[in-house]
Amino acid sequence: VLSMPFGTKLPFDHSLVLEGVGNAANAGVAFSRLGLKAGLVSNVGEDDWGRDIIRALKKQKVDTRFVHINNDKVSNYHYVLWYKEERTILIKHEEYDYHWPRFRQNDVPKWVYFSSISKNALPYHDQVADWLEDNPEVKLAFQPGTFQMEAGVERLKDIYRRTEIVFLNREESVMVTGGSYEDLHDLF
């Protein structure tokens, strides 16, 4: 349990600001560093933070042509609180108007890594699922975020159906499969 009195100042060890992070951005950077062609479909706000994110991704050789800058919006900013081996992430997704891009034929990726987006983006999942249906050669890796887990397997069944690789921790695996936490094999 995280508990702190309001109205006080709390000391901390240090802080570190990282631009262009999150599940999908991290994956894009990792793939680029491995020498693979990587791009990011994402949204940022029309602010310094959004420009810093795009600049950081370009520096890592991640294609940012499909990063949409949302006018009059701010960029997502999350806080990670670390204590020993444990962490808590304070999240807030901005309410962007999500649209899956129209790729030119030579820009269609071999793989899509789909991850956490905001609560209001459920219709966006349908756009992604429809696009995947129209592009059966494209493989999908899926790491559901907080709001996708809340939406449930039934609502996202078209995404799960097309998923080649899913990334879940044990608790999430129980939620998705209905299996037993104690029986790891039951979760596959």
Regions found by a protein language model. Name each.
Residues 23-26, 49, 74, 123:
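Short glycine/serine/threonine-rich phosphate/pyrophosphate-binding segments
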Residues 1-41, 51-52, 59:
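Glycine-rich phosphate/adenosyl-contacting loop at the front of the ribokinase-like
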Residues 16-18, 42-43, 118, 146:
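A generic secondary-structure micro-motif detector
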Residues 11, 15, 48, 85-91:
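Short, well-ordered strand-loop elements centered on a beta-strand within folded domains, enriched
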Residues 76-78:
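Glycine-rich phosphate-binding loop of ATP-grasp-fold ATP-dependent ligases
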Residues 20, 46, 121:
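Charged, low-complexity surface patches
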Residues 55-69, 81-188:
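Ribokinase/PfkB-type carbohydrate-kinase core domain
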Residues 41-46, 65-74, 188:
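Beta-strand->loop->alpha-helix junctions that form or flank phosphate-binding loops
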